[in-house]
UniProtKB/Swiss-Prot annotation:
Cytoplasm found in the keyword field: yes
Region (Sufficient for interaction with DLG4): 95-101
Name of the molecule in the record: Cysteine-rich PDZ-binding protein
Molecular-function GO terms, alphabetical: microtubule binding; PDZ domain binding; protein-containing complex binding; scaffold protein binding
Length: 101
């Protein structure tokens, strides 16, 4: 669960946008280069499990969180009805029987 404010912070999918004016994958905006070797230019974006950008742990159950920038895992966020990134209350779970099975 993610609130509307934190939804903007979520990562984007790598697939290119459909062509339109102002798309982020056109060469005019500097987004996508022609004839570029992806193996040489993607070293910064590669996943490094032991590097600086490690995933954090959940503040409730201490398991690893698989979403960068989140403080709570999806199971705990669903049970408590909070945003996984900021912890803001998203859903009133008073009359619900929440399980994460």
């Amino acid at each position: 669960m993610v609130c509307e404010k934190c939804e903007k912070k979520l990562g984007r999918v790598i697939t290119p946008d459909t062509w339109k004016d102002g798309a982020r994958n056109t060469t005019e905006s500097g987004g996508r280069k022609l004839n570029e070797n992806k193996a040489l230019t993607s070293k910064k974006a590669r996943f490094d499990p032991y590097g600086k950008n490690k995933f954090s742990t959940c503040r409730i159950c201490k398991s690893s969180v698989h979403q960068p920038g989140s403080h709570y895992c999806q199971g705990c966020a669903y049970k408590k009805g909070i945003c996984a990134m900021c912890g803001k209350k998203v859903l009133d779970t008073k009359n619900y029987k929440q399980t994460s099975v």
